[in-house]
From Swiss-Prot:
CDD domains: Adenylsuccinate_lyase_1. Catalyzes two reactions in de novo purine nucleotide biosynthesis. Catalyzes the breakdown of 5-aminoimidazole- (N-succinylocarboxamide) ribotide (SAICAR or 2-[5-amino-1-(5-phospho-beta-D-ribosyl)imidazole-4-carboxamido]succinate) to 5-aminoimidazole-4-carboxamide ribotide (AICAR or 5-amino-1-(5-phospho-beta-D-ribosyl)imidazole-4-carboxamide) and fumarate, and of adenylosuccinate (ADS or N(6)-(1,2-dicarboxyethyl)-AMP) to adenosine monophosphate (AMP) and fumarate. SMART domains: ADSL_C (SM00998). InterPro entries: AdenyloSucc_lyase_C, Fumarase/histidase_N, Fumarate_lyase_CS, Fumarate_lyase_fam, Fumarate_lyase_N, L-Aspartase-like, Pur_lyase. One of its GO terms (cellular component) is cytosol. It catalyses: N(6)-(1,2-dicarboxyethyl)-AMP = fumarate + AMP; (2S)-2-[5-amino-1-(5-phospho-beta-D-ribosyl)imidazole-4-carboxamido]succinate = 5-amino-1-(5-phospho-beta-D-ribosyl)imidazole-4-carboxamide + fumarate. The keyword Transcription regulation does not apply. Disulfide bonds: none annotated. This is Adenylosuccinate lyase. N(6)-(1,2-dicarboxyethyl)-AMP binds at residues 4-5, 67-69, 93-94, 212, 263, 268-270, 307-311. Its EC number is 4.3.2.2. Keywords: Lyase, Purine biosynthesis. GO terms for biological process: 'de novo' AMP biosynthetic process; 'de novo' IMP biosynthetic process.
Length: 431
């Protein structure tokens, strides 16, 4: 993983020492289960726990000879625990240890992500309420549409992230399965009771039908969920990038004292953090494809998934954690320019109220086509002049026959577009 995007506590979860500690935790859970079932002598687990040490360099040195990391680990621990080594890794295959340990890591990573995502939700909710009644222009196709509330825009982000909390909870549940079922998953050399007890100690459930491995659809679901969360963050980042354009300048991401925007142009304040989030979201999607490829392994298992997972598990979880933490800081500290929002609403000289005029003319008895033609005719004049849309309407003979000056002016009241904002917030809170 690129150190630039690695943050504690997530990065600490994926160190070599942490990996071997999880392996040892799985092995000890198995010996404890054997003990409790009376299948090995009492005291074995405690002695192994006291004598086994995580020696990364020793394991790597042995692996140079064995070319097998789990064998190197078993031999390394075996050299430390004397006679008890005959009960260590008893009846197991490498994937019993690897897959179960990976589940422990992914569950723990998921919990870290979940906690940070909930904090992000809290920030989004606070910002949404702060700007609940702040008018801003809504844009469709990048073009001014109708006024809306900036708080409502942020509420949409919050709503999506709340759904992502639920998705992530489901993804954690999806990978909360281990397997202690032997070489092809049929418990030939390790009884199911050992698996049940060992996994219960670890807080995991037995994979209902395993092969030599836990089926990889679980991991694909998990990584796909992480990519969906990242895409939601990207949506927020892209919106902020658009709103920070010089011509728009309604929102700006945080810009620290002493920060530089360009090596050549001192005036620049670029949305580099949101651009970074956009790029990292692309990487998150890239992790999904190989995880889907991992589902179709040969027969009861091949090892093609292993090299993929050494990359994607640590990288995807660390990348998303960085994205969530960074996005939280951006939204918490972004500058919201309410005056610029008002100025931008006025930029099109009242054209954003065209639908209200259309509906008023229909209300007065015109067909939709007749009303549309009148409104569009005056709107197109406005596009190409400095006059306000209302002025053209007040001069239009067809309009004057149907609508009074007071009625027309009332149609340009911006509060009309915010009248149901409180209802939307209240409805959302009830869900």
């Amino acid at each position: 993983m690129v150190e630039r995007y690695s943050l504690s506590p997530m990065k600490d979860l994926w160190t070599e020492e942490a990996k071997y500690r999880r392996w040892l935790e799985v092995e000890l859970a198995v010996t404890r289960a054997y003990e409790e079932l009376g299948m090995i002598p009492k005291g074995v687990t405690e002695r192994i726990r006291n004598n086994a040490k995580i020696d990364v360099e020793l394991f790597k040195k042995i692996e140079e000879k064995t070319n097998h990391d789990v064998v190197a680990f078993v031999e390394g621990i075996g050299s430390m625990i004397g006679e008890d080594s005959r009960f260590f890794h008893y009846g197991l295959t490498s994937s019993d240890v690897l897959d179960t340990a990976n589940s422990l890591a992914l569950v723990e990573a998921g919990k870290i992500l979940l906690e940070s995502l909930k904090e992000f939700c809290d920030v989004l909710w606070e910002v949404a309420n702060r700007y609940k009644h702040t008018p801003t222009i809504g844009r469709t196709h990048g073009v001014h549409a109708e006024p809306t509330s900036f708080g409502l825009k942020v509420l949409g982000w919050y709503s999506e992230m709340k759904r992502n909390v639920q998705r992530l909870e489901r993804a954690i549940e999806e990978v909360s399965y281990g397997k202690i079922s032997g070489a092809v998953g049929n418990y030939a050399n390790v009884p199911p009771e050992v698996e049940e007890k060992a996994l219960s100690y670890l807080g995991l459930k037995p994979e209902p039908v395993s092969t030599q491995v836990v089926p990889r659809d679980r991991h694909a679901f998990y990584l796909s969920t992480l990519a969906i969360v990242a895409a939601g963050i990207e949506r927020i980042a892209v919106e902020i990038r658009h709103l920070q354009r010089t011509e728009v300048l309604e929102v700006e991401e945080p810009f620290r004292k002493g920060q530089r925007g360009s090596s050549a142009m001192p005036h620049k304040k670029n949305p580099i953090t949101c651009e970074r989030l956009t790029g990292l979201s692309r990487m998150m999607r890239a992790y999904v494809d190989p995880s889907l490829e991992n589902i179709a392994l040969w027969h009861e298992r091949d090892i093609s998934h292993s090299s993929v997972e050494r990359y994607v598990f640590p990288d995807a979880t660390q990348t998303l954690y960085y994205m969530i933490v960074t996005a939280t800081n951006v939204v918490r500290n972004m500058k919201v320019n309410e005056e610029r929002m008002k100025k931008n609403i006025d930029l099109t000289k009242g054209l954003v109220f065209s639908q209200r005029v259309l509906l008023k003319l229909i209300e007065k008895g015109l067909t939709r086509k007749e009303a549309y033609d009148i409104v569009q005719r005056n709107a197109l004049k406005t596009w190409n002049s400095e006059k306000h849309f209302l002025e053209y309407l007040l001069e239009d003979e067809e309009v004057k026959k149907l609508v009074t000056k007071e009625e027309l002016e009332e149609l340009f009241d911006i509060s009309y577009y915010l009248k149901h904002v409180d209802h939307i917030f209240e409805r959302f809170e009830k869900e």
